[in-house]
Design a protein with these regions (language model features):
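Long, internal scaffold/assembly segments composed of regular secondary structure
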Residues: 257, 261-263, 267-282
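Membrane-embedded alpha-helical bundles of multi-pass integral membrane proteins
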Residues: 2-250, 261, 278-282
Length: 285
């Protein structure tokens, strides 16, 4: 695809690669799963009944049977091992093995929080020329794919709508992981939220608004335990997948506007000492 630039010259716009399209699909799919898992009873914890619900079935340790004398201590211990510790251990080990080999692939390909980070980055860059309020300088309008992203102050409106909208969506979604989803939806639609439900939504929405607007990158880099353990597992593997320098295309860096630094949604600087990153966001920029 081609498009004229400011001087009238034709600029080649690189189409998205198959890998980039797959990444977008996995992000959208996992975000939808994050929102829809509670109402579809795929996974949630119901405080009203005191146990998890997994794929429509109650997932319990069956300790009530021990309290009522209907099971022995040995049977209760086996239930705790098989239905409590073992599934958690398998999930944790599997997650760390994937991170050991492919780095923070969950962050870049699945994490619903990081999907919001990228959307707000893009909107904020359109509004003020920077993907973060803390960025010192505006980024070049010329993008790595050859397109031009022009600044427009009117994009502050959709940026703020996205911040508030995603904050509210996250708050409601988290509440449905703890209480019956359709009860929450009904209470919101009819204005019948209980005091505790209203306080939770108000506090969570406010916190997410602040985080999405001011500290979304800081949370991912320093506050997310899931990201931290992925990084630790990845650093333990000397042969893990990394982003490295392609010497055959080294001459392209002479006319480059630091595209890899500008494209990084986490505001890292791959051209510095942290050049071997452990996500795939910079592939084919």
């Amino acid at each position: 695809m081609t498009a004229p630039n400011e001087s009238g010259a034709i600029t080649i716009i690189m189409p998205r690669t198959a890998l980039q399209r797959w990444r977008s699909l996995t992000q959208v799919g996992f975000f939808a799963l994050f929102v829809l898992a509670p109402p579809l009873d795929i996974f949630r914890y119901d405080l009203t009944i005191g146990n998890f619900i997994l794929f429509g079935h109650h997932w319990t340790l069956n300790l009530d049977a021990l309290q009522h004398g209907q099971a022995t201590a040995t049977e209760a211990a086996v239930n705790v091992l098989l239905f409590g510790l073992l599934p958690i251990l398998l999930i944790v080990v599997g997650f760390l093995v994937v991170a050991w080999r492919w780095g923070r692939i969950y962050c870049g390909w699945f994490c619903p929080h990081f999907s919001v980070v990228e959307i707000i980055n893009r909107l904020m860059q359109r509004a003020i020329g920077k993907p973060s309020l803390w960025e010192q300088e505006r980024l070049p309008e010329a993008q790595a794919d050859g397109s031009v992203l022009r600044r427009n102050r009117w994009y502050l409106v959709p940026t703020m709508l996205a911040v508030v909208g995603f904050a509210l969506l996250w708050s409601v979604s988290l509440l449905t992981y703890l209480l019956p989803p359709f009860e929450i939806y009904s209470n919101i639609l009819h204005g019948e939220l209980t005091r505790n439900q209203a306080l939770f939504l108000l506090a969570a929405t406010t916190a997410f608004c602040i985080e999405f607007l001011l500290a979304r990158h800081l949370f991912c880099r320093f506050g997310c335990a899931v990201g931290l353990f992925q990084s630790l597992a990845w650093m333990a593997n000397r042969r893990a997948m990394v982003i490295s320098f392609n010497r055959q295309r080294g001459s392209a860096c002479r006319s480059c506007n630091n595209a890899c630094d500008n494209a990084c949604p986490m505001r890292l600087q791959p051209r510095t000492i942290k050049r071997k990153m452990f996500t795939l966001s910079l592939i084919h920029i």
